[in-house]
Amino acid sequence: MKYSRIVVMGPPGCGKGTQSSLISEKYEIPHVSSGDIIREEMKKSSKEATVIREMVNSGRLAPDEIVNELVLKKIRSMSKYILDGYPRRIEQAGMLGDDVDLVIFIDVDEDTCISRICGRNEGRDDDDEEVGRKRCMVYNKETAPVLEFYKRHGKLLTINGCASPGTVFEEIRRSIE
C-alpha cells in the first residue's frame, strides 16, 4: 500500500471505527481513534474531563485545544497510522499539516447513520436518536470545509459507506492498493 498516514472521516455512525480497524489489521498500521482517546479522557476526574463530558453528552464537539493536544501527542511519534474521527474542523486539519497522505471519506446518509447509532448497543451516552441527529447536524456544519480542504489538496477519497462493512472495506482496499 502506498499510504502510511491515513485519516478516515465520515458522519457519526458511518463506520469509521470499523473500517479503520479493518485497514489497520490488513496493512498492520496502528489505529488511532480520536473518539476512543476522548472517551478515555472522559473517565478521568479532571476539569478537562468534566468539560468534555458535558459537551459530548449534549451532542457537541469537545474543545479543540483539548482534542488537539490529546490526538497530536498520540500520533506525533508515529510514522504510520490510521486516524479516525479527527480532524473535524478546518483548524484541526491545519494542526495536522502535511502529516496526512490520504483522507478516506465514508459517505453515508443521515437516516442510515441514526439507525446505526441507535442500533449499536455499545452503551455510549451519545447513542440515542436526539443526540445522534444533533451530532450529524454539527458534523455537517463543522466538517464540510475539512472535506473541501483535503479535496483541494488532492488527498480525498470518497467511499459509499451504505453497503455492508465487508463490501465497503473491499472498495477501500481496491482504491488504496
UniProtKB/Swiss-Prot annotation:
ATP binds at G13, C14, G15, K16, G17, T18, R120. GO terms for cellular component: cytoplasm. GO terms for molecular function: adenylate kinase activity; ATP binding. Residues 119-127 are annotated as: LID. It is found in: Cytoplasm. AMP binds at S34, R39, R60, L61, A62, G85, Y86, P87, R88, Q92, R124, R135. It is an enzyme of class 2 (transferase). It holds the Pfam family ADK. Keywords: ATP-binding, Cytoplasm, Kinase, Nucleotide-binding, Transferase. It catalyses: AMP + ATP = 2 ADP. Belongs to the adenylate kinase family. Monomer. This is Adenylate kinase. The lineage of its organism: Eukaryota, Fungi, Fungi incertae sedis, Microsporidia, Unikaryonidae.
